[in-house]
Regions:
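Divalent metal-dependent phosphoesterase catalytic cores across multiple superfamilies
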Residues: 22-173
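Bacterial Sec-dependent N-terminal signal peptides
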Residues: 1-23
Length: 173
């Protein structure tokens, strides 16, 4: 194989691999939980559909379409609102688009306020991004927070059941 063809082939293969590894940049993550709704958001590096497959079992069975806006650096921030949910119930969801079939995650909707059912929250300080130490937040969550919650409120290591809400106020306070 000639050097120019070999170079172009390597460039194509490496570029394709890099492209696919950069499609999902952030998330998915949950926002604006209420007893009957949940907003799922994620960020990609390409324009793609905004679809969440979801249901009350891992079989899923429902699809809801959403929207996206252009974020910083031309990233696309996707938003899908799930509606008609039952309070204090577990739901499973995943991103499903033309480029991504994501991992299945789960959440539990908050109880109705009048039920006065207890649930646990965590309030954390603004973590700020530190490019010199990008894994600090993940390390704190995985090495400290999750084991603490499981030990303190343990329910078979079911984080969605043990921890209902995480509040990171940032510059809001």
């Amino acid at each position: 194989m000639s050097k120019p063809v070999f170079f172009l082939l390597n460039l194509f293969l490496c570029g394709t691999s890099l492209c696919f590894s950069q499609i999902l940049r952030v998330g998915p993550y949950l926002q604006n939980a209420s007893p009957n709704t949940m907003t799922v958001m994620w960020e990609t590096s390409i324009i793609d559909e905004s679809i969440i497959e979801w249901g009350n079992s891992t079989v899923l069975g429902n699809s809801t379409f959403g929207t996206f806006v252009t974020g910083s650096g031309m990233s696309k921030v996707h938003t899908v609102q799930l509606t008609g949910l039952i309070p204090n119930s577990r739901y499973y969801y995943r991103i499903h688009t033309t480029a991504i079939e994501g991992q299945t995650f789960d959440f539990i909707t908050p109880p109705l306020p009048e039920s006065e059912k207890n649930f646990n929250i965590v309030s954390m300080s603004d973590m700020q991004q530190d490019v010199a130490h990008p894994e600090v937040f993940s390390d704190i969550i995985n090495a400290d927070l999750i084991p603490f919650v499981d030990e303190r409120y343990g329910n078979n290591n079911d984080l969605a059941y043990n921890l209902a809400y995480v509040f990171i106020p940032g510059d809001l306070v």
